[in-house]
């Protein structure tokens, strides 16, 4: 939007957000060589709180009352199946609140609902270092209530994973292997979201970033502290990690050959990041991912919640992450969730505002 990105930006996708709110979001994977990607990135002042402040101000101007500590437990339908309101808990009492135009579900993920996680996405427990990301209130109430009135649910068995190490610089110069000591990624691929997806395709969703002292010396203090396993030989490092020493030594030897030629014939890693792993001691950093659920409610072009037949459920709408269509098994990139939240929220709001009062 014409904003100038200042010189304080970090040259790679390892960064902290500067005061300006503008930063470099790395585009290291050029899908089309003749159309190079453009460095980009923007965070509003105050980050998420900045959005909320503006929205709350708009609500105050319009006299909209926002009730907190009043969780909705059920949807209310009339005899014809129209959603006419909700049941909410206000302290120790339950009360019915009538919705004259409609109910919009915008409750997000079910990351924090252990029963739903165990039922729909038990695979996230395979890597003990992987953790859910999101708010503690992401309990799946919206999914439960919508399903209870016949809504079609989408992607309940999917997650959106984002691999994390101590930083992008940590992984980009290393060699990543799975539990079978097989390299499975270019290490530099665009965004942690794509790296996370590749990790979930490996045995037990686990792996290690392997590197040597030469590479470790380039890390910051936090990165270096995350190097959990250390040994004077590759075989010794494998034993410390519970990997096969012969297989890991073979994989490192193959990787070093690629580094020496400067051409990654396996995954196309840029020559700048092909560093021979040869200077002891050697290190291994366990790979993990943060995840969020993708399970959502099917909506139509008007943000109306629909049944498996495609028929809209009168009076019921969904917006934000809980509205299907945002993504499937893969988050397409940074900032996408926010754009989907604003788009579907505005769509649902306009549709509901145009509704006549329910009978």
Q: Model-predicted segments: where are they?
A:
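An anion/pyrophosphate-binding glycine-rich loop and adjacent beta-alpha core
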Residues: 17, 135, 139, 143-145, ...
